[in-house]
Amino acid sequence: MKFWGWMHHKFRENSKEPLKDASTGNSYSILSAHPSLDSQEVYPTACAGSRYNTGFRKQVNLFQESSFAGPKQYTEEDFKDERNSDFFDGFLAIGTLGGETLLDEQPATPTFGMSFEDPAIDDADVTENDLKLISNELDKFLEAEAKEGHHQPSGRNSDTNTIASTIEAIEGVDDEEDNQPMKFPLQEYFFGSLIELPESKIAGKKDRASLGELFQITEVQDKQSENIYGKKKKQPNSAHKSAKHLVKKVLKKIHPSSRGSVSGKPEVDSTKKKFQKMVQVFHRKVHPEESIMETKIYSSVANPKSSKANSIDLTFEKVNHCHEASKRCIQYELRSSRSAKNGEHWIKTDEDYFVLEL
């Protein structure tokens, strides 16, 4: 677009000289002063692009009209309007050429018919006017009521009368007003009904009971409390008896032999005997060899004749038992040494252990 502006400026400078000649009458000089379409300066610009041909032709036509018609003021604003209109005659301007002018020209701000005054100011004016009207009407109404109150005292009460009545009720000037409930002007509107105070006062004025009646009432209350306390005592006694009965039944089931026993001594003897028997069984299971030796000793004591033979047998058995035990130990050591070499260990069998069974 700068290039087009430069061309227009050149055309204007060139157009000044022919206009001077036109005033003297030289028409040839007018034609010769303007560059032709076939010149070298104009030809490259015309062939630069097909999209600018229309604009260039219009400029040439305008230049010719201005040169032949005489002096005519052709401002830059008119040229800009025509130049911008050329770009939208059926095609779009693609590229940077002409983009600067379009961006520089800001769109005009739209104008609306509405007034841009603050609405809050209008509202404030309206509300002030309304308040003035309302206040005037209220003043008129109150004045009319005041006049009616002076002339007709039996009419509707004014605000002053209601305020005076409330003050008198609060201060309690008269006794009759003290007994009556306080009447507030808006109490019925908010609460729906007056506060019922006289009922409580009437209840307090009931006849008092005599001393005899009071004594009778206390006696009746004492009897009732005693009956309740006695019932509470009977309940734990019955529960205690039932618990004892259950404990006795359990003991009888556990110790059935205690039924026939009358005294506690036989029970002690029986428990001792049971304990001794349990100990003997335990020793027999754990140490069967000692139990055999004990039986033989008891038999030798009972039969002294065969005691010598028994003693010989016992000594022989002891020697044999020790010999067998030594053999087992040697075998165990040999086995353990072999298993240690092979990475194995010997496990005892059930024959080497005595199982305790009760």
From Swiss-Prot:
The chain crosses the membrane at residues 87-107. InterPro entries: LAZY1. GO terms for biological process: negative gravitropism; positive gravitropism; regulation of auxin polar transport. It is found in: Cell membrane; Nucleus. A motif (Nuclear localization signal) lies at residues 231-253. It comes from the Eukaryota. It is a single-pass membrane protein. A motif (IGT motif) lies at residues 90-96. Expressed in shoot apical meristem, vascular tissues, stele, endodermis and upper portion of the inflorescence stem. Expressed in the endodermis of inflorescence stems and hypocotyls. Keywords: Cell membrane, Growth regulation, Membrane, Nucleus, Transmembrane, Transmembrane helix. The keyword Transferase does not apply. Disruption phenotype: Defective shoot gravitropism. Increased angle of inflorescence branches. GO terms for cellular component: nucleus; plasma membrane. Changing residue 94 to A: Switches the shoot gravity responses from upward bending to downward bending. Involved in the regulation of shoot gravitropism. Involved in the regulation of inflorescence branch angle. Functions redundantly with LAZY2, LAZY3 and LAZY4 to control plant architecture by coupling gravity sensing to the formation of auxin gradients. Involved redundantly with LAZY2 and LAZY4 in the regulation of both shoot and root gravitropism. Mediates gravity signaling in statocytes downstream of amyloplast displacement, leading to the generation of asymmetric auxin distribution in gravity-responding organs. Belongs to the LAZY family. This is Protein LAZY 1. The gene is LAZY1.
